[in-house]
Amino acid sequence: MNCFRYSCQEFVSGRVSNVPREERFLDKVTTSDGTVGKALELLDRVAEKKRPVRFTELLADSPHPKATLHRLLRTLLRQEMLSYDRDRQTYSLGLRLVTLAHAAWRQSSLAPIARPFVDALAVRLDETIHLAQLDNGQVLYLDKRNAADPVEMFSQAGKTGPGYCTGIGKAMLAFLPDDQRRMAIQQQGYFAHTRHTITNASALSDELAIIREQGMAFDREEHETGIICVAVPILSSKGRPIGGLSLTSSTQRAALADLHKFASILHLQAKEISRAAEHWQFPSP
């Protein structure tokens, strides 16, 4: 499983490296200051390259002077956040990040509890099943099971995606407490991934009101052309979303109307997961 997310700067609430550049800028909610922020931004730059990177490349992309960049790199190397290949003179992400990513996943993830239910759904329905949690208004994919004949799509366990244009994201956003929901609506980037994407806060607010009434959400090719899904929230005993479940297919395999029949099955499994997770504490969305 790929436990890395887009942003090291926002390790617990980052964006994904292969989200379009326009959206990365639009969706960026916070920035960090000081030495720690600079170091984490540098980790982001290395991660974005998707390959070992030379000092000259980092310097070309860096807003910092050469001496500052050297100092940051030395610190990250000492902390094993970066590794250095002397022969190739390149930097890459360090193994300590893998350890931290796995630790974060174990400590705060619903995935270990929900795994048997996700497995059962995938076998029974033979469609792609997603498990996710909200992360600062975005979708953090915790687990994914492909159909026997898998459909290529963006999602992957460990990745973060937009909340406003995914079925599973909208299913969770809809059941947030009012003040948190309003804040999450304002946090969205509203980048138009497809011609079906919701691109403003008012339209999303209206959509979430409908989802609260119906208890389920749909992705109508809003994030990826040709990809559709039905999703439900996993609610705590207090009615707060601790996660979400979705069944995803393609328009070549099914029509959106065909997915309605799966909602009741997803709801049953969501309730089972909620009961199994009753004594666990997870970070608030």
Model-flagged regions — what are they?
Residues 2-15, 144, 150-156, 216:
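C-terminal regulatory/oligomerization modules of transcriptional regulators
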Residues 2-112, 271-279:
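N-terminal helix-turn-helix
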Residues 197-270:
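Extended hydrophobic
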Residues 32-36, 90, 94, 107, ...:
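Short, structured helix-loop boundary elements
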Residues 87-188:
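Amphipathic alpha-helical effector-binding/dimerization core
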Residues 164-166, 260-281:
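Short, solvent-exposed cationic patches
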Residues 180-185, 189, 270-285:
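Cysteine/selenocysteine-centered motifs that mediate thiol-based redox chemistry or coordinate metal-sulfur cofactors
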